[in-house]
From Swiss-Prot:
Species of the source: Pseudothermotoga lettingae (strain ATCC BAA-301 / DSM 14385 / NBRC 107922 / TMO)
The protein's role, per its UniProt record: Plays an essential role in the initiation and regulation of chromosomal replication. ATP-DnaA binds to the origin of replication (oriC) to initiate formation of the DNA replication initiation complex once per cell cycle. Binds the DnaA box (a 9 base pair repeat at the origin) and separates the double-stranded (ds)DNA. Forms a right-handed helical filament on oriC DNA; dsDNA binds to the exterior of the filament while single-stranded (ss)DNA is stabiized in the filament's interior.
Protein name as annotated: Chromosomal replication initiator protein DnaA
Chain residue ranges for the region called Domain III, AAA+ region: 101-317
BP GO terms, sorted: DNA replication initiation; regulation of DNA replication
Region (Domain IV, binds dsDNA): 318-444
UniProt-annotated stretches for the region Domain I, interacts with DnaA modulators: 1-66
Alphabetical list of InterPro entries matching this protein: AAA+_ATPase, Chromosome_initiator_DnaA, Chromosome_initiator_DnaA-like, DnaA_C, DnaA_dom, DnaA_N_dom, DnaA_N_sf, P-loop_NTPase
Length: 444
């Protein structure tokens, strides 16, 4: 019956979740009306009880045909110490110790590499493949640019490829809370032993949280020294460069700078578009390419905001049963409401085209192929479609052109802007700024 329980649970979970959280999960005992499970440590036990308790209960009821009680036990510290000290026993593999849950999506495979993060990505991958080679690694950059993704990716890689290596991933807030808790319970030595003697890799996120907290900085300093002197890998993430960590002990800042310091920059529009594509793919969502471009143009400053925008559109599609078009995306994401103003946005666009390019509305709507007229018309179509959210049919009607002509024109301008034609890009931006009140194309 043990194997049936395991297989039934496994079939209800995706592979990443199973490997991340159920790697040490096993059936210890089956009674007449209860089942006892065992996992590797307390944190995993608490996480499984909280997140998957109802699923476990439902699975047991299905298999036994009646309600079953269950409890999850974890290997005690004493048991682990006994196993470690018993030389006659076969070697017991030490699974990575994950204090804060790893997001199963945040792997190297799912990280989109661009010019802004190439060095950071390559360094983190090298650290994962060869722990201790670049030590310490200090990764910094603005909020929502992928630091945590890379940090957790290291954890996932080690969990998969180095099962004997003891890895701790946690936030600096968690590190502080653990210390405070150990002080309250008079177990500071246990805390120190855990972080200095029982791990091989420390992955510490959001170290800027410790700014101004002298006591915990001192503890981190000594922990850092112990790990470093033993050749154990340390990776630290922050939203700022080590030198910008105000109210941080100088000796600790100097430790951060001993190894490799690398920064993640803001992604360019092309990388943002690829990120939006990857996120949509991971969510199994179908969104038009122009919608993904809209999101990448307007949320490139913070990838968490970008994902939030994407999820909002996906949820709308799921709840309403309707496919989101470009104009609906503008509305749902509240991007520059001014061009959804009821006071004839078409008229505002046409007037702006005439004013900026020095042509008349009659020329724009005519069959004239004069270079200056054709260019003004084409840029007007592009802005109407990509910046104002008009449908292709609406753009075709407005400029008195066929649907295929409009589609071809927009594709042609897209190719020109992607190839780096700054003249065209600046003209598009000027018109877009005039009709929307903001510059949406940040790459200009």
């Amino acid at each position: 019956m043990k194997s049936e329980i395991i297989e039934s649970l496994k079939s209800k979970l995706n592979r990443r979740v199973w490997e991340s959280w159920f790697g040490t999960f096993d059936v210890k005992e089956i009674g007449p009306d209860y089942v006892v499970f065992q996992v590797g440590n307390l944190f995993i036990r608490e996480w499984l009880e909280k997140k998957y308790g109802s699923l476990i209960s439902k699975t047991l009821r299905e298999l036994f045909g009646k309600p079953m009680d269950f409890r999850i036990e974890h290997a005690s510290a004493k048991t682990e110490e006994k196993l470690d000290s018993n030389e006659d026993e076969p070697l017991v593999k030490k699974r990575p110790l994950i204090l804060t849950p790893l997001n199963p999506i945040l792997t190297f495979e799912n990280f989109v590499v661009g010019p802004n993060n190439m060095f950071a990505y390559s360094t983190c991958l090298e650290v994962a493949k060869n722990p201790g080679k670049y030590n310490p690694l200090f990764l910094h950059g603005g909020v929502g640019l992928g630091k945590t993704h890379l940090l957790q990716a290291i954890g996932h890689y080690l969990f998969k490829h180095e099962p004997d290596m003891r890895v701790i991933y946690l936030t600096s807030e968690r590190f502080l809370n653990e210390l405070v808790d150990s002080i309250k319970k008079n177990r500071v030595q246990e805390f120190r032993d855990k972080f200095r003697n029982k791990i091989d890799v420390l992955l510490l996120d959001d170290v800027q949280f410790l700014i101004g907290k002298t006591g915990i900085q001192t503890e981190l300093f000594h922990t850092f020294n112990e790990l470093y002197n033993e050749g154990k890998q340390i990776v630290v993430c922050s939203d700022r460069d080590p030198q910008q960590l105000e109210k941080f002990q100088d000796r600790l800042v100097s430790r951060f700078q001993m190894g490799v310091v690398t920064k993640i920059e803001k992604p360019d529009e092309e990388t943002c578009f690829k990120i939006a594509q990857k996120m949509a793919q991971l969510e199994n969502a179908e969104l038009q390419e122009d919608i993904l471009k809209l999101i990448s143009k307007n949320f490139s400053d913070n990838l968490r905001r970008l994902r939030g925008a994407l999820v909002k559109l996906i949820m709308y599609q799921q709840i309403s049963g309707e496919k989101v078009d470009l104009q609906k995306a503008f509305e749902l994401l509240a991007i520059q409401n001014s061009y959804h103003n009821k006071s004839l946005p078409e008229e505002k666009l046409m007037n702006s085209i005439c004013e900026i390019f020095g042509v008349s509305q009659e020329e724009i709507l005519s069959k004239s192929r004069k270079k200056e007229v054709a260019l003004a018309r084409q840029i007007g179509m592009y802005v109407a479609r990509n910046y104002m959210g008009f449908s292709l049919r609406k753009v075709a009607d407005m400029f008195k052109r066929s649907h295929p002509t409009v589609s071809h024109t927009i594709q042609k301008l897209e190719e020109l802007t992607n190839s780096g034609n700054m003249v065209i890009k600046s003209q598009i931006d000027r018109l877009a700024r005039c009709v929307t009140g903001q510059i949406l194309d940040q790459s200009v």
